[in-house]
Amino acid sequence: MGPKLLESRLCLLLLLRLVLMLASCLGQTPSRWFAIQHINNNTNLRCNVEMLRINRFRRTCKGLNTFLHTSFANAVGVCGNPSGLCSDNISRNCHNSSSRVHITVCNITSRRRIPYTQCRYQPRRSVEYYTVACNPRTSLDSPMYPVVPVHLDGTF
């Protein structure tokens, strides 16, 4: 049982590296991609408009996306909170926010196998705490923040 657990952890780490490399190829650091996908101070955002911005990078319809109505600096501040286990039950670089923020969850309503420019979304708005995974900044990130959010692990 031990070797299989080790193999699955190695596979997960390789997959994470691949995702980070893909983000770099798109000209985005993981923290910049996090900000593009999840940070938006406009509490009245229109899902169809904002998701088109994200889908242009992906060239496909993303099924679900959560926007945090806070600043990137506030999300970085969450990285200073105590760390804990992430939802993958392996990584331990997740941090819970200490206050709730307004969020908008955009859920796809159109068929996913259509041109990404035609995706349609339904918003769901609420006020929740959130969890982010944080990593040391890359050389391409601002030196202002030594540790940055790279993944929205969930809301609660």
Curated annotation (Swiss-Prot):
Disulfide partners: 47-106, 61-119, 79-134, 86-94
Keyword Glycoprotein tagged: yes
Positions of the catalytic residues: 38, 151
MF terms in GO: endonuclease activity; nucleic acid binding
Membrane-spanning intervals of the chain: none
Residues modified by glycosylation: 41, 89, 96, 107
Leader sequence residues: 1-25
Positions bound to substrate: 62-66
InterPro entries, per the entry: RNaseA, RNaseA-like_dom_sf, RNaseA_AS, RNaseA_domain
Keywords from the named record: Disulfide bond, Endonuclease, Glycoprotein, Hydrolase, Nuclease, Signal
PANTHER family named among the record's database cross-references: EOSINOPHIL CATIONIC PROTEIN (PTHR11437:SF3), RIBONUCLEASE (PTHR11437)
Family under the similarity heading: Belongs to the pancreatic ribonuclease family.
Protein name: Eosinophil cationic-type ribonuclease 3
Annotated organism of origin: Mus musculus (Mouse)
